[in-house]
Amino acid sequence: MTNTRKSHPLIKIVNHSFIDLPAPSNISAWWNFGSLLGVCLGLQILTGLFLAMHYTADTTTAFSSVTHICRDVNYGWLIRYMHANGASMFFIFLYFHIGRGIYYGSYTFMDTWNIGVLLLFAVMATAFMGYVLPWGQMSFWGATVITNLLSAIPYIGPTLVEWIWGGFSVDKATLTRFFAFHFILPFIITAMVMIHLLFLHETGSNNPSGMNSDSDKIPFHPYYTIKDILGILFMMITLMSLVMFTPDLLGDPDNYTPANPLNTPPHIKPEWYFLFAYAILRSIPNKLGGVLALVFSILILMLFPILHSSKQRSMSFRPLSQCLMWMLVANLLILTWIGGQPVEHPFITIGQLASVTYFFTILILMPSTALMENKLLKW
């Protein structure tokens, strides 16, 4: 008789995805982030569900309902800070996951890569709307500034902004709809993750060498299940250390002041994981230009498969491309730092230089260096 694991219509899907899945024998810890992102998503949905049980999406009570969660609900503080810091962990892993994809040339799986970029957009939208919900100063002004950017769209812009707001300013209608979208999007993200995995399992995983690994596969379970569990353990240690010792380390103190439309905070800035994009947005003096640069700074990821000009897939054996890759990482860290600084000299100039370097590295330097490496290897 056939094993239930292999014959049951539902269980066999799980079996082919997580148990009997043939995986390359040499994938490193950089391949752990996919499963960590899955755990993060589950954790966010779970903690978010419990928060939604006590939260009220109304401008008069939203702030005090969050206070009530932290003070009066059993372990409410724990759930709230796990959700807030869980989002930070989510983005750390997302950026590592994308960085791994760029370094090892995983973007050549175009279907998987493109759905991944769409996933990034969906997660960013979810995080942005979630940040608005506590209705603190930074929530309100962040929502006002970012939604206002859409007014830069020619002809339909101003109407579109008022349509999103549900009025003539960020108010009760905006908060209610943001809560609704923030609740539904993670489930849409979960569906997209399944499509992401479906496309990945059509081709199988990439590996550090970038070569075909069909001749050397091992079963996912127990080898990579145990490896993933170790990764999850490290993640939980980091997350719980953050939550227990410095829960507000990554947050903004301004968000502990209830939203006040009559008083603007001294420095309006998003959460740390959006600062690099915010810096690119601010580095262009024109509103529409800034918005286009902001969108393109993420959308540029979709160009990686087209711009790939090397005869090798991975950067493992390409020292010059490796240098550029780490230059890009350093560049993004500089942009993140600039995004959190006030708009004054010398930060404006540094931000503009870093923004230009970001696009120049991806669009010009990386493809031309890859071509040069081909020449050096007489290909």
Curated annotation (Swiss-Prot):
> Which Pfam families would you find in this protein's record?
Cytochrom_B_C (PF00032), Cytochrome_B (PF00033)
- Kindly list the positions annotated as binding a ubiquinone: 201
Residues engaged in binding heme b b566: 97, 196
Keywords of this protein's UniProt record, alphabetized?
Electron transport, Heme, Iron, Membrane, Metal-binding, Mitochondrion, Mitochondrion inner membrane, Respiratory chain, Transmembrane, Transmembrane helix, Transport, Ubiquinone
Q: How does it sit in the membrane?
A: Multi-pass membrane protein
How does the cofactor attach, per the note? Answer: Binds 2 heme b groups non-covalently.
State the Gene Ontology terms under molecular function: metal ion binding; ubiquinol-cytochrome-c reductase activity
Q: Where in the cell is it found?
A: Mitochondrion inner membrane
Looking at the UniProt record for this protein, which Gene Ontology cellular component terms does it annotate, in alphabetical order? mitochondrial inner membrane; respiratory chain complex III
Alphabetical list of InterPro entries matching this protein? Cyt_b/b6_C (IPR005798), Cyt_b/b6_C_sf (IPR036150), Cyt_b/b6_N (IPR005797), Cytb/b6-like_sf (IPR027387), Cytochrome_b (IPR030689), Cytochrome_b_C_euk/bac (IPR048260), Cytochrome_b_N_euk/bac (IPR048259), Di-haem_cyt_TM (IPR016174)
Major subcellular location class:
mitochondrion
Q: Name any cofactors this protein relies on.
A: heme b
| Subunit | The cytochrome bc1 complex contains 11 subunits: 3 respiratory subunits (MT-CYB, CYC1 and UQCRFS1), 2 core proteins (UQCRC1 and UQCRC2) and 6 low-molecular weight proteins (UQCRH/QCR6, UQCRB/QCR7, UQCRQ/QCR8, UQCR10/QCR9, UQCR11/QCR10 and a cleavage product of UQCRFS1). This cytochrome bc1 complex then forms a dimer.
The entry's function note states: Component of the ubiquinol-cytochrome c reductase complex (complex III or cytochrome b-c1 complex) that is part of the mitochondrial respiratory chain. The b-c1 complex mediates electron transfer from ubiquinol to cytochrome c. Contributes to the generation of a proton gradient across the mitochondrial membrane that is then used for ATP synthesis.
Entry's family note: Belongs to the cytochrome b family.
Q: What is this protein called?
A: Cytochrome b
Please spell out the taxonomic lineage of the organism that makes this protein: Eukaryota, Metazoa, Chordata, Craniata, Vertebrata
